[in-house]
Regions:
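C-terminal long alpha-helix characteristic of the crotonase
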Residues: 2, 10, 89-94, 136, ...
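Glycine- (often His-adjacent) and acidic-residue-rich active-site loop
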Residues: 2, 6-9, 13-16, 23-61, ...
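Glycine-rich phosphate-binding loop at the start of an alpha helix
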Residues: 32, 52-53, 76, 133, ...
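CoA-thioester-processing core
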Residues: 54-61, 69, 75-129, 142, ...
Length: 227
């Protein structure tokens, strides 16, 4: 996970990049944490070293949109990693799950929190307490995935197409859009609407707001300056 965080932070700082796609192989999206490594830890080890805290860096520090393109297995930490991304696309036969209960523990990298927010308490409770897996089609039907695809290739291509679309817009507006949607998860509707309005107003201080609205009025394609 350290290597992934390092790469994402570098891409986040690269001004030529507007959005990112995170994917694995056709067989598996991500393997999750090392169970053999975990099996030797006690409470002092896990708590003292903030075990798997690094898994929280992606949603907390990356400002550009990240799209997960999930094929194959996404279990445990792999499922949590997919849910950390801003948009989740998946193959209809992708295999999701939080099987930690079978190991005598629970999800530790946000699985219980993000899954509950996405699909509701009852379904999340069922999945986490039974350790049952669910398919990519289920993920889409339940609202966890934004899109579902018939083949692994279509999954990756679809994610790349969306990333290219996002990258074609003003970096400032995209960053603001991600910020306000994420903020909606942390506060009530009244506070969220007020926060959104403040961020909306702030964009009127950008060059891109002038460029975008003038281009619309003149029926031209905007040439963003990203400032």
């Amino acid at each position: 996970m350290h290597e992934l965080n390092t790469a994402l932070k570098a891409f986040d700082k690269d001004t030529s990049i507007g959005a990112m796609v995170l994917t694995g192989s056709h067989k598996a999206f991500a393997a999750g944490a090392d169970i053999k490594e975990m099996s030797t830890k006690d409470f002092a080890d896990a708590y003292g070293e903030d075990f798997i805290e690094s898994w929280s860096e992606l949603p907390n520090t990356i400002k550009k949109p990240v799209i997960s393109a999930v094929n194959g297995h996404a279990l445990g930490g792999g499922c949590e990693l997919a849910m950390m991304c801003d948009i989740l696309y998946c193959h209809e036969k992708a295999n999701f799950g939080q099987p930690e209960i079978k190991l005598g523990v629970i999800p530790g990298a946000g699985g219980s929190q993000r899954l509950t927010r996405a699909i509701g308490k009852s379904k999340a409770m069922d999945i986490i307490l039974t350790g049952r897996n669910f398919s990519g089609r289920d993920a889409f039907d339940w609202g966890l995935a934004a899109k579902v695809f018939e083949t692994p290739e279509q999954t990756v291509d679809g994610a790349l197409e969306t990333a290219e679309t996002i990258a074609s817009y003003s970096r400032l507006a995209v960053k603001a859009g991600k910020e306000v949607v994420n903020k909606s998860q942390d506060q009530g509707i009244r506070e969220g609407v007020e926060y959104e309005r403040r961020v909306f107003h702030s964009l009127f201080g950008s060059e891109d707001q002038k460029i975008g609205m003038q281009a619309f009025a003149e029926k031209k394609k905007p040439e963003w300056k990203h400032r």
